[in-house]
Amino acid sequence: MADNKDISVLIVDDNDMTRETLRVILRHDGYNVVGEAMDGDGALEMATRLHPDIILLDVVMPKVSGIEALKSIRMVMQDVQVLMVTANKDQETVTEVVKSGISGYIIKPFNAKKVLDTVQVVALKVRASRSGKAV
């Protein structure tokens, strides 16, 4: 297991199984999963309370979409790293997600390697930012 406990992660997805899968993958690799939310409103509340380093944020959720939640989160936390999680591969969605100022995205269905590879790139940015180095 890697030593990633210095990186805190918030998981936001309306699907219980997806949240559980991401939690297991990340914790197995040593990441500190500090919270989980089921919708965009919960994402904003937990992000402002917990100040995670990384947020894994589903694009399509009831009430408030991931993209709308991201806009709200960015208003109060400009530096948080956000990885969007989506099952939608169409170019329009990917373009909208990328334009929203994210650090990357994970396409569903995903596997542990894809999740960990993507999160590791962002974790390196977090660590570099803490030490004042550019990535």
Protein language model regions, located:
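Two-component/phosphorelay signaling modules centered on CheY-like receiver
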Residues: 16-35
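Receiver (REC) domain active-site loop signature in two-component systems and cognate sites
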Residues: 61
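Alpha4 helix (beta4-alpha4-beta5 surface) of REC/receiver domains from two-component response regulators
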Residues: 68, 89-104
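Active-site beta3 strand of CheY-like receiver
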Residues: 50-56
